[in-house]
Amino acid sequence: CFTSNDIYGETSLNFIKEFPHADIIKSKRIDALANNIYKSTKGYLPYSRCLTKAKKIKELANNSYPGIEVNSCEVNNLINIVDIIIYNSNKLDEVKKDIINLAKQTPYFDIINSIYGIGETSTAQIIAELGDINRFENIKQLNAFCGLDPTIIQSGKSINYNGPISKRGNRNARKILFITCCSIIRSSVLHNIDTDILVYYRKKQAEKKHFKECITACSTKLLRIIFAMCKNNSLY
């Protein structure tokens, strides 16, 4: 009913806090369960979907055999843990807003944020890791800073200048670029938009590259785009 990705989301946590035991769910009407879900989603999820989820949860509760009583200390502990998670999540959201506001004070925010598929949070993270992009004289320096520069492999008289990436640079920057590329590709496919990153990803797929190689190549491509845009002070 709640996927593993959503278990720590607002909807799941509010539901668990309100109905922390199967016996409590058994005693509630389906519409009461659905109303809780609908309220937490702020209307984003259609009420019919909320009813479907509520029916499934009710069915699972009716077929369950809890190992603890509804008034046990474990149930109270669960409620307390949920409160802590909600509190920390709210604080994390506040920190994200502060980081975004700081990033907006730089000349790079609007430029990077104009790239399709990159949201404000990702933009702020990229700026936080790359810093002042104008301090890099060329893209090779920026690639090396992120550890995306290729290694040189020498075997006898043979030299391969296009080996695997060095991974010697900023690993956080690589991770953010990797995740951002995945987000751009998903959004591009969902909305049927042939962005530069999606086109490049499909090109690498056609070359029979495996997923990680494709995304690594896309990360390098994205970094080149960001570097050129920031140097030329131009939007996407």
Residue ranges and their predicted role:
Residues C1-Y236:
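A detector of single, family-specific signature residues
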